[in-house]
């Protein structure tokens, strides 16, 4: 970590805690700043605030009092989840207090080069794939960012010989100014988080900030399957490396079932460790980063063939009596489940689906359900899921929860079949989040394996 004097004896307000705010507070204190933390959660329910107070950091909890900004703060570090129309943020802007993001703070002190990954879907899987391949190739890749490891915490142990492989959300990117990765990946761009950004154009503009400071000596990896990529590519100073599953490009591409990088065959799509058309795209982006980083083809192929996915994201859980289980609890919409289904033989597949409908058009799923061996349906959207199953002429059973659904699926499955949890719905009708839903699937698998 670079020891910089920019924040020495400067009064800085951290607005919002969570993991990133806590990490930023500790880093700034280490850099000699006079830190105040403000979080809306009450102090007695706020272990992070309690821990910071014990370290001598000033904390104000329970609300965001605008009058706090009457103090003479020289910077604000804003939690990514707090929108720019928040009264505290608006007041800071009116007072011309510079607002920093936690990832930019990490960038200021990083000795290690940064590979930044953003996009609407596939960020976590691609980030993890890239780190795995770099580490397999003898490099030292450190996961950081939106993947659960705050960048301003990871950067404190990173040295010049490391590489920060950083997952970045639109919330994290919208406020950056100086941030400059050496390699950036945009997996894809879809209309999401519009409640935060206001429009798709503003959402894209936030994502596009990842390359704002890049030069021709830096590399920007874009999804050439999307028309928007060609438009955006004309507006960057970075060297663009495209990837595509639909056409041959001057980068990474799929041709006749083989993944290539600039005419060099790397791996067959059927040899990838994770199924699904979206994972071919993720692998192509990873191949581009790996080749730019000097990783040998055989190491890339070996690593991608053994990659088992990320927890809850088309995660290969294991086998019982030659029946394979996949946990795709993160698939909370139709598109995600469609992509998951693309990687399997429907005739040998039992799909567990259903949950809280957030405006899905279930008829869109019907073509992807054709030929399924069986569906196990659950949750608030069960009636709509049943109608889709009927249109696809797929038989189904109902279950009260994921555990019961998994047990039913296992009873129906035969040697060589696959059981896939890919709900196509949110979890909140039955579970606090998709992680808890997926964990129930994993726990049930463990019980079934123990009884087998």
UniProtKB/Swiss-Prot annotation:
GO CC annotation terms, alphabetical: cytoplasm
Pathway: Cell wall biogenesis; peptidoglycan biosynthesis
SUPFAM superfamilies reported in the protein's UniProt record: MurCD N-terminal domain, MurD-like peptide ligases, catalytic domain, MurD-like peptide ligases, peptide-binding domain
Catalytic activity entry: UDP-N-acetyl-alpha-D-muramoyl-L-alanine + D-glutamate + ATP = UDP-N-acetyl-alpha-D-muramoyl-L-alanyl-D-glutamate + ADP + phosphate + H(+)
Keywords: ATP-binding, Cell cycle, Cell division, Cell shape, Cell wall biogenesis/degradation, Cytoplasm, Ligase, Nucleotide-binding, Peptidoglycan synthesis
GO molecular function, one term: UDP-N-acetylmuramoylalanine-D-glutamate ligase activity
Name of the top EC class for this enzyme: ligase
Subcellular location as annotated: Cytoplasm
Record-listed E.C. numbers: 6.3.2.9
Major subcellular location class: cytoplasm
Family annotation (InterPro entries): Mur-like_cat_sf, Mur_ligase_C, Mur_ligase_C_dom_sf, Mur_ligase_cen, MurD
Entry binding sites for ATP: 119-125
GO biological process per UniProt: cell division; cell wall organization; peptidoglycan biosynthetic process; regulation of cell shape
Pfam families membership: Mur_ligase_C, Mur_ligase_M, MurD-like_N
Role this protein plays: Cell wall formation. Catalyzes the addition of glutamate to the nucleotide precursor UDP-N-acetylmuramoyl-L-alanine (UMA).
PANTHER family attached to this UniProt entry: UDP-N-ACETYLMURAMOYLALANINE--D-GLUTAMATE LIGASE (PTHR43692:SF1)
Descriptive protein name: UDP-N-acetylmuramoylalanine--D-glutamate ligase
Gene encoding the protein: murD
């Amino acid at each position: 970590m670079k020891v910089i004097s920019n924040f020495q004896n400067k009064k800085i307000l951290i607005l919002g805690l969570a993991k990133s705010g806590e990490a930023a507070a500790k880093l700034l204190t280490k850099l000699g700043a006079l830190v105040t933390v403000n979080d809306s959660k009450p102090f007695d329910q706020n272990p992070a605030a309690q821990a910071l107070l014990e370290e001598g950091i000033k904390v104000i909890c329970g609300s965001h009092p605008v009058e706090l900004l009457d103090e003479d703060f020289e910077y604000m570090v804003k939690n990514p989840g707090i929108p720019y129309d928040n009264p505290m943020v608006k007041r800071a802007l009116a007072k011309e207090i510079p607002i920093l993001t936690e990832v930019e703070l990490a960038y200021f002190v990083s000795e290690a080069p940064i590979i930044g990954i953003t996009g609407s879907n596939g960020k976590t899987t691609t980030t993890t794939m890239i780190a795995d391949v770099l580490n397999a190739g003898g490099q030292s890749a450190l996961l950081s960012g939106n993947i659960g490891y705050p960048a301003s915490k990871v950067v404190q142990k990173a040295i010049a010989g490391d590489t920060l492989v950083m997952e970045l959300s639109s919330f994290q990117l919208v406020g950056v100014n100086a941030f400059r990765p050496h390699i950036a990946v945009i997996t894809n761009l879809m209309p999401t988080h519009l409640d935060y950004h206001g429009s798709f154009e503003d959402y894209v503009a936030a994502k596009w900030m990842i390359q704002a400071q890049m030069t021709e000596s830096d590399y920007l990896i874009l999804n050439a399957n999307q028309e928007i990529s060609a438009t955006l590519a004309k507006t960057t100073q970075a060297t663009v490396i495209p990837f595509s599953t639909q056409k041959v490009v001057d980068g990474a591409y799929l041709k006749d079932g083989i993944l290539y990088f600039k005419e060099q065959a790397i791996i067959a799509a059927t040899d990838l460790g994770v199924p699904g058309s979206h994972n071919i795209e993720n692998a192509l982006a990873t191949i581009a980063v790996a080749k730019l980083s000097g990783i040998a083809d055989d190491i890339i192929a070996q690593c991608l063939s053994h990659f088992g996915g990320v927890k809850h994201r088309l995660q290969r859980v294991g086998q019982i009596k030659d029946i394979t289980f996949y946990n795709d609890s993160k698939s909370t919409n139709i598109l995600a489940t469609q992509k998951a289904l693309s990687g399997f033989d429907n005739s040998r597949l039992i799909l567990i689906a259903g949950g809280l409908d957030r405006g899905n058009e279930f008829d869109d799923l019907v073509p992807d359900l054709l030929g399924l061996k069986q569906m196990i349906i659950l949750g608030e959207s069960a009636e709509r899921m049943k109608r889709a199953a009927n249109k696809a002429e797929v038989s189904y059973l109902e279950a009260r929860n994921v555990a019961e659904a998994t047990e039913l699926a296992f009873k129906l499955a035969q040697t060589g079949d696959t059981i896939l949890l890919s709900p196509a719905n949110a979890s909140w009708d039955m579970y606090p989040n998709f992680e808890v839903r997926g964990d129930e699937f994993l726990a049930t698998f463990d019980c079934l394996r123990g009884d087998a």
